[in-house]
């Protein structure tokens, strides 16, 4: 299925019971899709992201982001998942700060990306978030 270009599932994802993926979905490393999560066709789910139970994902989800609801809304950073993967507390705090820049300050995507890029030297994992944002077409709750 995946070798024919119908979608991409990378490694080490957790797909809980009754998670449904439509065609051409891409799921990044260490993403967790909780029970009864629905993912619309052509959506991309970023690395280390998390969906709450019963979430309906109709747009792309950036790396590290926790989404919940129907339709899905970005809620916070997947801090618990990051701790389990060995991320340091300081790095998780900086990713939270990056999330707030992206989702809570009312900035356009271009301005938010500029601010995030200034944080990469101190917190290299923010580059993963930036890269995922640049690859996504339609994503959650950002101007």
Where are these regions (language model features)?
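Helix-turn-helix DNA-binding module
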Residues: 24-32, 112
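Residues that scaffold the ATP/ADP-binding catalytic core of kinase and kinase-like folds
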Residues: 24, 60, 76
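Glycine-rich beta-solenoid repeat tracts in large extracellular/virion proteins
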Residues: 4, 20-21
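A contiguous pocket-lining binding segment that forms or flanks enzyme active sites
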Residues: 32-66
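Single conserved hydrophobic/aromatic residue that forms the stacking wall/gate
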Residues: 1-10
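Conserved SAM/SAH cofactor-binding pocket of Class I
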Residues: 5, 25-26, 38-39, 43
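Right-handed parallel beta-helix
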Residues: 11-18, 28-30, 47-48
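Terminal amphipathic alpha-helical/low-complexity segments used for targeting or macromolecular assembly
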Residues: 1, 64, 70-143
């Amino acid at each position: 299925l995946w070798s024919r270009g119908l979608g991409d599932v990378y490694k080490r994802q957790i797909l809980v019971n009754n998670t449904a993926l439509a065609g051409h979905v891409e799921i990044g490393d260490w993403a967790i899709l909780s029970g009864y999560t629905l993912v619309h066709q052509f959506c991309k789910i970023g690395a280390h992201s998390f969906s709450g139970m019963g979430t309906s994902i109709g747009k792309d989800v950036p790396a590290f982001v926790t989404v919940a609801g129907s339709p899905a809304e970005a809620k916070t950073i997947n801090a618990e998942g990051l701790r389990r993967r060995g991320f340091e507390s300081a790095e998780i705090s900086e990713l939270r700060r990056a999330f707030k820049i992206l989702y809570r300050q009312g900035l356009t995507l271009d301005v938010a990306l500029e601010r995030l890029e200034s944080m990469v030297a101190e917190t290299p994992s923010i580059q993963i978030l930036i890269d995922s944002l640049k690859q996504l077409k339609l994503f959650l709750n950002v101007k």
